[in-house]
């Protein structure tokens, strides 16, 4: 079926993972009410009448903090497989990982110096 026989289960998982949301969206398209006016355009707030407008401005600190979090979260995603296969990869992979970590530490120092981690 697949060129890499060890990955048949993974391919099946990917197909199911793509089919379930697609099936949910298609089912919603056929079963949902067709009304486009009135209550459908209102903001839903826990079954209560909405209080105030739906558009509010967030402080930029939330975005900066989230951006720094995403950067270091992605770092963890990249470093975990490297740590698992550390003994097989050799010295070159170790040097590459050190360069990667150094770049991220420079980015952390820059964010710290610019005050992106300050909350006050």
Swiss-Prot record:
GO terms for biological process: photosynthesis, light reaction. It is found in: Cellular thylakoid membrane. Its EC number is 7.1.1.-. Keywords: Membrane, NAD, NADP, Plastoquinone, Quinone, Thylakoid, Translocase, Transmembrane, Transmembrane helix, Transport. One of its GO terms (molecular function) is quinone binding. It comes from the Bacteria. It catalyses: a plastoquinone + NADH + (n+1) H(+)(in) = a plastoquinol + NAD(+) + n H(+)(out); a plastoquinone + NADPH + (n+1) H(+)(in) = a plastoquinol + NADP(+) + n H(+)(out). Its main location: membrane. PANTHER family: NADH-UBIQUINONE OXIDOREDUCTASE CHAIN 3 (PTHR11058:SF9). NDH-1 can be composed of about 15 different subunits; different subcomplexes with different compositions have been identified which probably have different functions. Belongs to the complex I subunit 3 family. This is NAD(P)H-quinone oxidoreductase subunit 3. It comes from Parasynechococcus marenigrum (strain WH8102).
